């Protein structure tokens, strides 16, 4: 069973965390199931970038991304070459390491 390692996040997960997950789950579902309140303003419909995350290890083991996800990711704050929308990234059979950016587009607009 693969594991997902969330790096420490100042507000959502100060000490980081490691959780077992099932192959085929999305990063967002694993986060929510483990009480990580990762924002997802569009309710997992690939219409916003609030669930943006950066994959630090295991990027190539995730599902491929769609053109729609790529277009939405272009609007994400702090975009990197290994960025994914956590609502779309499906976990494979390899452990991954995920960084949740300190800010997301909603935070920047609202604050």
Swiss-Prot record:
Stored Pfam families: Fer2 (PF00111)
Cofactor needs: [2Fe-2S] cluster
Keywords of the record: 2Fe-2S, Electron transport, Iron, Iron-sulfur, Metal-binding, Transport
The 2Fe-2S ferredoxin-type domain, residue ranges: 1-104
GO molecular function: 2 iron, 2 sulfur cluster binding; electron transfer activity; metal ion binding
UniProt-listed CDD domains: fer2
UniProt keyword Ribosomal protein present: no
Keyword Metal-binding annotated: yes
GO biological process: P450-containing electron transport chain
Highest taxon of the lineage: Bacteria
GO cellular component labels: cytosol
Cofactor binding summary note: Binds 1 [2Fe-2S] cluster.
Function: Ferredoxin are iron-sulfur proteins that transfer electrons in a wide variety of metabolic reactions.
Family designation: Belongs to the adrenodoxin/putidaredoxin family.
Protein name: 2Fe-2S ferredoxin
Lineage summary: Bacteria, Pseudomonadati, Pseudomonadota, Gammaproteobacteria, Enterobacterales
Gene: fdx
